[in-house]
From Swiss-Prot:
The organism's taxonomic lineage, starting at the top: Eukaryota, Fungi, Dikarya, Ascomycota, Taphrinomycotina
Name of the protein described by the UniProt record: V-type proton ATPase subunit c'
Plastid keyword on record: no
Function text: Proton-conducting pore forming subunit of the V0 complex of vacuolar(H+)-ATPase (V-ATPase), a multisubunit enzyme composed of a peripheral complex (V1) that hydrolyzes ATP and a membrane integral complex (V0) that translocates protons. V-ATPase is responsible for acidifying and maintaining the pH of intracellular compartments.
Assembly description: V-ATPase is a heteromultimeric enzyme composed of a peripheral catalytic V1 complex (components A to H) attached to an integral membrane V0 proton pore complex (components: a, c, c', c'', d, e, f and VOA1). The decameric c-ring forms the proton-conducting pore, and is composed of eight proteolipid subunits c, one subunit c' and one subunit c''.
């Protein structure tokens, strides 16, 4: 049933939130993986013994994609063709998806840049490893902030249509 508070198009915004969460977070994860992978490939030719330690940025980039998956599944779980879906919920889900997705892009970019340069520096100087991991953790937390905000937003939905 369509009303002013629950128009027929309100689910579009919810689905846009699902899409934004997945697309942007995976874009960030893919970029971070590609950049860090390029550095690992360059290092592996000179010091193959440090390749396994150098995989940390790639793993951390992959976690950014998982944040987007979690948010997308939660948003999609709130949507059903059998139940009313308010415009308020649509906007909340869109903002939650954008919060997770866009912080995922920022975190993925930061992880990729730090991972690429950090791994190359680690090849030359072993003491760099701890500093690189600390900076990677701070970059990963950017994506985690978005997930936390998205989860808080997602709990505020309301499908009251009267």
């Amino acid at each position: 049933m369509s009303s002013n508070l629950c128009p027929i198009y309100s689910s579009f915004f919810g689905f846009a939130g699902v899409c934004a969460s997945m697309v942007f977070s995976c874009l960030g994860a893919g970029y971070g993986t590609a950049l860090a992978g390029r550095g690992i490939a360059a290092v592996g030719a000179f010091r193959p013994e440090i390749v396994m330690k150098s995989l940390i940025p790639v793993v951390m980039s992959g976690i950014i994609g998982v944040y987007g998956l979690v948010m997308s599944v939660l948003i999609a779980g709130d949507m059903s063709p059998d139940n009313d879906y308010s415009l308020f919920s649509g906007f909340i889900h869109l903002s939650a998806g954008l919060a997770v997705g866009l912080t995922g892009v920022a975190a993925g970019y930061a992880i990729g840049v730090v991972g690429d340069r950090g791994v190359q520096s680690f090849m030359r100087q072993d003491r760099i490893f701890v500093s690189m991991v600390l900076i990677l953790i701070f970059a990963e937390v950017l994506g985690l902030y978005g997930l936390i905000v998205g989860l808080i937003l997602q709990t505020k939905t309301s499908n009251v249509c009267y």
